[in-house]
């Protein structure tokens, strides 16, 4: 563990600061106050990489990261349960529901945080009032088994999945189980109407409970195709040598913005502020990219196999509409698939 001047120099380098005296003094001041607190509590849905991010921060600052790592739904539920009990136990939070973060901001539950790296984020990737920024973006796509599908048969659009040759050959997930399918179903209903899913239901897709289940079915060859998957799961499988390809369909690619925020009255405010700056750094963005994730920073190259958002046709769902209608939409989807 590095302390004192060595840790400060390493942290300044890790944040990719410009090297100006003012920037260095600001970091030095925050580091000193944060080290007195000694700990930052992070609730994160960044499964698989949170430990690496936390370890890097600890190495560079000497400040311990107390990590709660779980799926987004569990992170949100934990925060809500503690809030209703009048408790603020987390400092920094991260999950994939931008809607909930905006709701908490409107309820004055989030701190407004200055961000040295603000210019490195596109307008849609950062809150104008400093309540959050996008740590990562999740894109949806189609995964396929390269050994089972001939190149000429690989679906290039969402509509291609309706080809009768894919009868009982598609793994799919209900929007009642995850946020990513919500975005995909909303987009495709906007484009094609519910008739799209009535046609898909006739092909008897295998309904699965998670992205991981869908990818594993593709890897094993149980089914050759998985629709509405989170692209990074398929990309990570391909990095490990699995015969998995990813398609970003031509009609549009649903994008989920996954924010980071600091809770109002955080128990370790100085450590929280420093960790928030650290998470926005290019160093962390590049660490995420190596893990198959699309950083919210505009200056970080996307992971291998993942195009930049501007190279796709990104679709951002109406969060207000989803908040009011997601249950009804999921019920309609499930009803169609059960027929």
List PLM regions with ranges.
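Immediate post-signal peptide segment of exported/extracytoplasmic ligand-binding proteins
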Residues: 23-41, 58-59, 163-168
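Extracytoplasmic ligand-binding site segments that recognize negatively charged/polar headgroups
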Residues: 43-54, 66-222
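A ligand-binding cleft/hinge motif common to bilobed small-molecule-binding domains
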Residues: 98-103, 224-243, 292
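Short beta-strand->loop
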Residues: 110-117, 130-133, 159, 236-254, ...
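Periplasmic-binding protein-like
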Residues: 138, 166-177, 198-201, 207-208, 240-266, 279-302, ...
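A bilobed periplasmic-binding-protein/Venus flytrap-type ligand-binding module shared by bacterial periplasmic
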Residues: 141-148, 185-186, 256-268, 287-288
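Extracellular/periplasmic bilobal clamshell ligand-binding domains
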Residues: 304-339
